Amino acid sequence: MIGKYSVIYADPPWRYAQKGLQGAAEKHYPTMGIDELCTLPVADLAAPDSVLFLWATFPQLPEALRLIKAWGFTYKSVAFVWLKKNRRSEGWFYGLGFWTRGNAEVCLLATRGHPKRQAANVHQFIISPIQEHSRKPEEAREKIVALMGDVPRVELFARQSPPGWDVWGLSLIHI
């Protein structure tokens, strides 16, 4: 499938080096260090004109920007900001954070070549409850399709197999 995908959607299994975060993700799935992530042949999957949507937490922003370059893309903007609500109540969800109690998570947008967006009315905010560890809201996939159209797309590090998406990942419920 070399050069096939116009959209690559990724939520890498970041390995945290900061004290206190080590092992949190590992309780749920295998993680990867930045050097290991950078060696993945993602550039080979991308069409000449393609978009990468890459989830990153704020502590991982430098690594996310490095990964974008390693995969052959150029950072453009923040595609989405996920404002997390509690799962069982109407309030906001707050993580522990480093300096302040964290809530939001960002999905970065990077391009290769000159992809064209199909809609100009896709908003950046996603306000939805947290789910199981690290699972992103379905609304993100819906917004990607609205923004880019029904083009060949793949989700890396997938935890499920949504209709219309090719998937790759260790955490698939079924293949």
Locate each region found by the language model.
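Conserved Class I SAM-dependent methyltransferase catalytic core
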Residues: E36-R88
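SAM-dependent methyltransferase catalytic-core segment centered on the flexible catalytic loop
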Residues: I2-L54
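Residues immediately flanking
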Residues: P12, F58, R112
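Short catalytic/ligand-binding loop motif for oxyanion handling, primarily in non-cytosolic enzymes
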Residues: Y16-Q18, L61-A64, R117-Q118
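Conserved small/polar residues in nucleotide/adenosyl-binding loops
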Residues: I173-I175
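Short alpha-helix plus adjacent loop in nuclease-associated cores
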Residues: K84-W99
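Flexible, glycine-/basic-rich loop-and-beta segments that form/coincide
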Residues: G95-P152
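Conserved GTP-binding G-domain of TRAFAC-class P-loop NTPases and closely related GTPase folds
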Residues: K143-I144, P163-V167
